[in-house]
UniProtKB/Swiss-Prot annotation:
Protein name (Swiss-Prot/TrEMBL): GTPase Der
Gene: der
UniProt family annotation: Belongs to the TRAFAC class TrmE-Era-EngA-EngB-Septin-like GTPase superfamily. EngA (Der) GTPase family.
Biological process, per Gene Ontology: ribosome biogenesis
Keywords in alphabetical order: GTP-binding, Nucleotide-binding, Repeat, Ribosome biogenesis
Top-level division of the source organism's lineage: Bacteria
Organism, scientific name: Mycoplasmoides gallisepticum (strain R(low / passage 15 / clone 2)) (Mycoplasma gallisepticum)
Functional summary from the UniProt entry: GTPase that plays an essential role in the late steps of ribosome biogenesis.
Domain EngA-type G: 2-167, 176-351
Length: 456
């Protein structure tokens, strides 16, 4: 796929342009300079043609604790991109940072560079004073306002017009899209860098280094995956700035854009209430979740240590009993392959399709062996079961009246279905519906998940 990188000094509207192009607010946008630190990837479609857009941190001559690492990230983006959008701001004018960015880009004579002048709001284009911008050495800029969508169509036309110069790159089908979530400093970015085999995101002992939810596609054993790394979620009292509040929102959005979750824990410390809260997000999302215990190389172990830690996890995360638990060290690159082995197992279970006759045999047999308890004045009777379409295994059980369902019996049936069809690593959903039209009007359908049931 064609790759286009957005490069420029801080606060020229790079992230606003990125969000405008992908039509989705992924990058954090704020007036505070330096908000974007890592490379952020997104897909753009225009006139039936697609390309990948890369947002980058701001280039500056000023000293900053992260500036050297940010510049390294920008350099990575330039190296992998086919086209560079060099963005300046008409509102702020040019300064030493613009000239610094221009000097860096001029070193890449083999790259196609589109000079973009942003933050042109209501000015008449014919009355703009552009003389100072010619001094940067990239000719006349394309005039846009990312915030107000002015000139965006022309910019997209320019990019698509150059696409044929780079040939058609065959797009490989994704095996899985997953996000990595966890509290700050558990090693999410270290894991991402191992997966991508390069320093894609900033890694530091300072919690909160990653602010955005960062998309990246990568190949493992010749198969393509998409991973979304997220900012760590802090305790509510520690969310001191609006930037970190945005980061929590990005994490929640990352989950909504994923098909699977890697919940990272720090194996070198005890589990915390914060870990439990984040685990609750996994349950609410109702997505397959792999519990990844990181920093296992730092733990003093004997032959019982792993099992004891697993018991602690099961006790804390009772609402995720189906989630597999794996132990890794991202920094030392230990047991990373177990992540992909587990993903493949989960993918296989998600694809299981069960014939209606076989499903009914299992449910009716379970129904005969263990009769439902009397609940709300009557006993539940199940007459028919079928598998419905869904992102996770979903089953509809037609019964005399869902009001007679006790949650313990729903859990019993779920476990029987899991055992019969090998659905051990994925969440499943049971819908109990009345077979009788009259009862359907008088009662509500019941949706059951592992830890309880909700009225629909």
């Amino acid at each position: 796929m064609l790759k286009v990188a957005i490069v420029g000094k801080p606060n020229v509207g790079k992230s606003t342009l990125f969000n405008r192009l992908i039509k989705n607010r992924i990058a954090i946008v704020d007036d505070t300079p330096g908000i974007t630190r890592d490379r952020i990837f997104g897909d753009v479609e225009w006139l039936t043609k697609r390309f990948q857009i890369i947002d980058t941190g701001g280039l500056t001559t000023e000293s900053d604790v992260f500036q050297r690492a940010i510049e390294q990230q920008v350099q990575f983006a330039i190296d992998e991109a086919d086209i560079i959008l060099f963005v300046c701001s008409y509102k702020e004018g040019i300064n030493a940072d613009d000239h610094y960015a221009a000097k860096l880009l001029k070193k890449h004579k083999n790259k196609k560079i589109i000079f973009v002048l942003n933050k042109i709001e209501n000015q008449n284009k014919d009355q703009l004073n552009l003389s100072s911008y010619f001094s940067l050495g990239f000719g006349k800029p394309m005039i846009i306002s990312a915030e107000h969508a002015i000139g965006i169509g022309d910019l997209l036309d320019e990019i698509i017009g150059l696409k044929d110069q780079f040939g058609n790159k065959k797009e490989q089908e994704l095996v899985a899209t997953f996000c990595i979530i966890g509290k700050p400093n558990v090693g999410k970015s270290s894991l991402l860098n191992q997966l991508l085999k390069k320093e894609r995101v900033l890694v530091s002992d300072i919690p909160g280094t990653t602010r955005d939810a960062i998309d990246a596609t990568f190949s493992y054993n010749k198969e393509l995956y998409k991973v979304i790394d997220t900012a760590g979620i802090r305790r509510k009292g520690k969310i001191a700035t609006r930037i970190e509040k945005f980061s929590v929102q990005r994490t929640q959005q990352a989950i909504s854009r994923s098909k699977m979750i890697l919940l990272m824990l720090d194996g070198s410390v005890d589990l915390s209430e914060q870990d439990e809260v984040i685990g609750g997000l996994c349950y609410e999302a109702n997505l397959p979740t792999i519990i990844v215990v990181n920093k296992w190389d730092l733990v003093k172990k004997d032959d019982k240590t792993m099992e004891l830690f697993k018991k602690q996890i099961r006790s804390k995360f009772k609402y995720l009993p189906w989630s597999p638990i794996i132990f890794i060290s991202a920094k030392a690159n230990l047991r990373i392959d177990t992540i992909f082995q587990t993903i493949k197992l989960i993918q296989a279970q998600l694809k299981i399709k069960i014939s209606t006759s076989l499903l009914n045999d299992v449910v009716q047999k379970a129904h005969m062996i263990n009769q439902p308890p009397i609940f709300n004045g009557n006993r539940l009777s199940i007459t028919y079961t079928t598998q419905a379409q869904g992102q996770i295994p979903t089953f509809v059980l037609f019964c005399n009246n869902p009001d007679y369902l006790h949650f313990s019996y729903a859990r019993y049936l779920e476990n029987k279905i899991r055992e019969a069809f090998g659905l051990s690593y994925v969440p499943i959903t049971l819908y109990f519906k009345s077979k009788n039209a009259r009862n359907r009007k008088l009662s509500k359908d019941v949706k059951f998940k592992q830890t309880g049931y909700d009225l629909e």
